Structures are given as C-alpha cells and as structure tokens.
C-alpha cells in the first residue's frame, strides 16, 4: 500500500476579507481582497488502495473506520466527507493534521478542502486546482448552510501573496 503526503498552506487576510461574498462585490461594483499563504501547513496522508475506508484526524482525536463509503456525512468529519464524496475517489486511508486550530480565522477548513480535493484528484497546487474553487465554495456553503466567499481557497491552491479582484456587473 503506497502512502502519499500532501501539504497545503493556511492563509492570512490583509484587506477585503468579506468582500468576496456575492452580492456584496456586485453591489459595490467590484472590489479587491488581499491575502497570502503562510508557512503553516495542513498535512494530509493518504493511501488509495486497501479494504474499506479509514479517516483519522489527529487534531480532533477522531477516527472513522467503515467497510463501505457512508452515504451520509459522519459526525465530526462531515466537511472531510463532503469534499471526498464530491471528488468521486475517496481514499482507503486518510490522516489529517493541522498545526492551526479550527476557528483561528486562518481559513483552515477552506485550506483543508483544497488539500483534500487536490489529494483525492491528484491535482498539485496551480491553476488546475484553483479551477476547483467554485466546487469547494458551493460544498462549504452547503456544509455551513450559509453563503460563503471565494478568497479563502486561493492561497492554498496557488500559494503566494494574492490580490483577488471581484468584479461587479
């Protein structure tokens, strides 16, 4: 069983953090969000083959072991399940670790989503992975049952410092 390792950076916002929400940027006639990837990494280890499925979150102290991929999100791992389910290729074994706690304001869940989708689909950081941002935004909106923006995902997908332009009509 071959084990793969993936890492994605979390991000910090400098300006325009909520301006990426529709219809805010449309009402303003366009705006800019400035953020950057930082040297704090969400780590994902996975194996694509094996019997059943196992998801382990070292930070949350959660482990899920199932024979078949569950049809509904499991408690405590619903975001992970939602992204992997959307990928169409959930791995046999998955281990997650983040040095940054959830709720820190550094976009951990969004960055985790980018890493999970990239790892499951075999997409490295770059334009290919960034093209999946609309899927992740919609999945997170469904997960949270609230509108979500775009900007949290791009530093994890592209790296570096970014000035993201949101155009109005």
Model-derived features: positions:
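Anion-binding (especially nucleotide phosphate/pyrophosphate-binding) glycine-rich loop
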Residues: 4-5, 39-139
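ATP-dependent small-molecule kinase catalytic core of the GHMP/sugar-kinase superfamily
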Residues: 2-11, 16-33, 57, 122-169
């Amino acid at each position: 069983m071959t084990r793969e390792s993936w890492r994605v950076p979390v991000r910090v916002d400098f300006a325009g953090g909520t301006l990426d929400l529709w219809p805010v940027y449309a009402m303003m006639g366009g705006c800019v969000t400035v953020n950057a990837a930082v040297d704090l990494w969400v780590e994902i280890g996975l194996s694509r083959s094996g019997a059943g499925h196992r998801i382990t979150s070292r930070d949350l102290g959660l482990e899920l072991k199932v024979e078949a991929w569950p049809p509904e999100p499991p408690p405590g791992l619903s975001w992970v399940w939602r992204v992997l389910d959307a990928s169409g290729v959930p791995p046999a074994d998955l281990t997650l670790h983040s040095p940054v706690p959830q709720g820190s304001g550094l976009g951990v869940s969004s960055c985790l989503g980018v890493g999970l989708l990239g790892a499951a689909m075999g997409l490295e950081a770059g334009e290919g992975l960034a093209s999946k941002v609309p899927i992740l935004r919609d999945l997170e909106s469904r997960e949270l049952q609230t509108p979500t923006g775009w900007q949290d995902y791009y530093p994890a997908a592209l790296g570096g410092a970014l000035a993201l332009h949101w155009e109005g009509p």
